[in-house]
């Protein structure tokens, strides 16, 4: 509550859910997107500020928005292209949550150069770290469904693909053509 956070790929499916949820908890959300088309979408789903990382340096913009203080946490599902600048957005003892590779596999992190100077925390969680039992998975799922049911989180399907078009869906995902949740149906 009351924190400002950065979420990369804010207009994507995970981003849309995260940004709404964070805003409902009282956070100020800064989101990044890769096109002007996605700015409006990210704002619709809870971002207070949106940065097109193809037009401006998101680290510089975040530092400007925070009066050079930096952020307590960054959530990054993009990966390779954003990791180093994301670490630069963090304030002293900030936390970097790296959970995806949309731009490619992460390079090794130079702990002495990128982590140690500010005493940062870097984590790379997967769903298995939070839902190791069926009960934990059910509990986490129920929390999401409660947020959807209450209207705090709205989920709109961006596109439906038939199973025979699964390869097209994958290409669209890799090409960043998907603006929100997409599903494949039989």
Residue ranges of predicted features:
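Terminal helix/beta-alpha structural elements that buttress the NAD(P)+-binding lobe
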Residues: 1-186
